[in-house]
Amino acid sequence: TPTTQNTLSLHDALPISDSSEDERRLGEQAVFPETVDVNIRQLDPIPAPRAFLREQPLTDEMSELVLHSRQEIRDVLNGRDDRLLVIVGPCSIHDPKAAHEYAEKLAAVKRELEDRLVIVMRVYFEKPRTTIGWKGLINDPDLDGRFNIRKGMWLARKVLTDVLSLGLPAATEWLDPITPQYICDAISWGAIGARNTESQVHRELASGLSMPVGFKNSTDGSIKAAADSCFAAGFEHHFLSINLDGRVISAETKGNPDCHLVLRGSSHGPNYDAESVRQALEDLKVSKASGPSQHGLVIDAAHGNCGKDENREAEVIEEIAERLAHCEQGITGVMMESFLVGGHQKPAPLDQLVYGQS
């Protein structure tokens, strides 16, 4: 009867089981139609996040460093700490040994300048591509096209624990929405790149992340999408994700009040000049007037702000420092790319690359 049908719950109406044994048995019995996985060559299982966290746990000291540095970054962004946030390190991590050597040197600089700077090491494992190319340590750790993602994820946690053991907080770019469950416990600052700043998936992701997140302006130079993302990520969202046991779940977030804008220039030129910063802050004020928070911004000295010429990054930083010395308001941090050897090289097997060069 209609009355009986109305009393059925969704769980009653759908063949859903919480039993892993039932799932296994149903999976063995399932016959998938020809409409499924047409373009999939292979499906390789990866251990759940909890397995990686259990095998490579953070020590109490590392966890305390992550929590403390996240709060330091929040205080800088909100003007409660007058130090400058500095996010610096390789374009992306491809050689854990070289990354460790670089981290040792940066840790010494951090200790020397910690009364003036909040230094965070750039530890990027995922590379967004305009078309195709090497997509980072997690995706292809051996740079040989074998895509050993299990090894890549293990190496990512190894690099992070090495960096934290030296007393350095870590920053990374969030690209794949599953990756955070594997490494976010070790991250103090996160970025959403220019190619993903309009993505609803990444706005939702940022709303649930436990650290401050910077949204970069679009590749065409527009800051509207990034400003909208900062606003949207400050509110609660509901979306599909996985938990630490690898089960698909519906995530409900509280919203991230610590999202902010990163100016990285564009194909049309730089946007770190005083007028661009003033206009960006004004646009943020308008777009976030009724939002959860209002922060200063971060200048990325690389990409469009240096014309993709790594030798100009230092010039950008020097100009920013001079303007801050003259009390320019609104700039709360800077980003720059740096490694043991200047310049960059094309991807190749590790033994064919220049050691310590991005």
Residue ranges and their predicted role:
Residues 1-14:
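Short, small-residue-biased leader/transition segments that mark boundaries at the very start
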Residues 18, 28-37, 116-283, 303-319, ...:
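Active-site-facing alpha/beta catalytic cores
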Residues 107-108:
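N-terminal intrinsically disordered, cationic/polar leader segments
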Residues 91-97:
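Short, glycine-rich nucleotide/cofactor-binding loops
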Residues 37-78:
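N- or domain-start disorder-to-order transition segments that initiate the globular core
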Residues 74-82, 286-294:
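Glycine-rich phosphate/diphosphate-binding loops that line cofactor/substrate pockets in enzymes
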